[in-house]
From Swiss-Prot:
The gene is limd1. Keywords: Cytoplasm, LIM domain, Metal-binding, Nucleus, Repeat, Repressor, Transcription, Transcription regulation, Zinc. It is found in: Cytoplasm; Nucleus. Disulfide bonds: none annotated. The keyword Repeat applies. Residues 414-475, 479-539, 540-608 form the LIM zinc-binding domain. This is LIM domain-containing protein 1. GO terms for molecular function: metal ion binding; transcription corepressor activity. One of its GO terms (biological process) is neural crest cell development. Belongs to the zyxin/ajuba family. The lineage of its organism: Eukaryota, Metazoa, Chordata, Craniata, Vertebrata. Interacts with snai1. It comes from Xenopus laevis (African clawed frog). It comes from the Eukaryota. PROSITE patterns: LIM_DOMAIN_1, LIM_DOMAIN_2.
Amino acid sequence: MDTYDELSLEASKFIQDLTLYEASKDGLFRVDKGLSNNPEFEETKRIFAAKMAKIHLQNQQKSIPDTGISEGNGLTHQYNYSLPKSVEEGPVIYNGLSNSSVGPSDYKTYRESYKGKPDIDSADRSEESVFKHDSEIMLPSPLGKVGNTIPTQQFTSKKAISPSIESLERERTIKNNITGFENYRLCNSSSMKNCKPHQNSRHGEVEDTMAENFTENKTPFKQCSALISSSVTFGDDTHTNIPQKKLFNLPSTSSINTQNNSDDVYLSKTNAAKEFHGEQRGLCSTNSLGFGNPNDVISASYCVGYNDNFPGEIKQKQSPHYTFHSGHSSVDEQPQAIPFCCKDSSGQGPASTIDSDHTDILQDSSALMKIKLPCQTLSQSSKQGSSKAEKKLEAITRHVEQEMDAHNKADYFGTCVKCSKGVYGASQACQAMGNLYHNGCFICSACSRKLRGKAFYFVNGKVYCEEDFLYSGFHQSADRCFVCGHWIMDMILQALGKSFHPGCFRCVVCNECLDGVPFTVDMENKIYCVKDYHKILAPKCAVCSLPILPSEGTDETIRVVSMDKDYHIDCYRCECCALELNNEDDHRCYPLDGHLFCHNCHLKYLENHNLS
């Protein structure tokens, strides 16, 4: 039984821990920060998160065929922008390089012309780095290598690859190799690496070494993981004379679809955030990058603290007008965006550096972040409502307790005949017709007036006051007097189950009125006063032949019964020596031949009787 008790205790602890989750706006549940230092609760969270991660991974793998490839303009409904019809078909060439030179595991990008023009605020421009016209951006490959570049100015392709099985294979290859981003680390759990401006063979390229720029501030960033939370988009300004910003966003979920559209390059967005769980990784993701002409800007990048023990998905909302805001993160309570250190096209120095104002923003991610558990709520076991019988029993119990508390010190007289409740206190008691009532229960049946201390009439089981009885016709059914036989029109006296006029209720011996006086009756129901009753019906003493009456001032009669005879106490003596007999040893009675003797006289009487 001890084993079962321990299991029950552990289960109850687990349920109590789960009931401490606080509901958040997005439907998930967050853990109280005060419980983060509990080792048992941390172990429970770790096991629970591992199970939920497997389920989350299986669900995402099932949904990949549905979100991976669509034909024609199928993605226009998802992203709310239209794609132009395909004109020609052919391989995509970036700055003279075909897609075969990039490799099957690299990103395949396609141009796309948007209906809306990106609108960048002047405040955003002040915090972002400005690239020159023909700059190129270094992008990490899915395998974690650096060096594959995507030109930002010239896209000479006029044809787009139609969707085919090859596209599916490429997408699966990219999905399987998406973990290569883990090697592309820009920050670790202890401190940021040193970053120095690096001059590449091609000016304006941003390599992975630009994360080393965090050395200048030496900002600690614990438990920093990468979540890339945007989509890759390219704009083309050939359709209009207005300068158009070309935005480049690293995809948060790293899956690329090819569509049967020419002169359009785009990257579709799929759910692959499930690849970023496991050990705590360090990555920094760019919110949005602008390039293509001197007015293009690179927005501030940010590092998102993420606890891999609890896999979750940090989503960033996409602006419907393709605008972006630097310095803001899509996750609540995350550090503000910090601009990267990048070189301009001339390679003469960094176009923008990390501001000193941002050094205080990066703090311990454990203190800034609220952990989200991807679990369903565990409904607390609500108490079932009590049944009607239980509620009634509780009400009766409370009522009895209240009465006991209210009358614990009062005198208890008995139970009321009418309401069957206890009568406490002389001020609440009323006695009539040999029964006990509450003052509020003994009332007139017609007018409901209290009848305590007043004349009343009892007719056919009902009680009436004098006014209602005399002037309302109740006297027609009144009783007749048992002695005189007349109708009782005023007050009535009831005794022995009969009704009497008060003046007719008298002693049969002395004819004294017994209204309000103690009386008694004999076997023939004759009425006597107490004095006459004892004179006539009282037992007589066997010695003096006088009636044995009560002592003066009392109603009790004391007598001695011996040999079926009654004696006064004073008459109960030895007939020979006149010794008073009682229960004492020397005064005990020893009757012989109908005579009362003491012990000595009894022996003498026996000796004389034997001699004779």
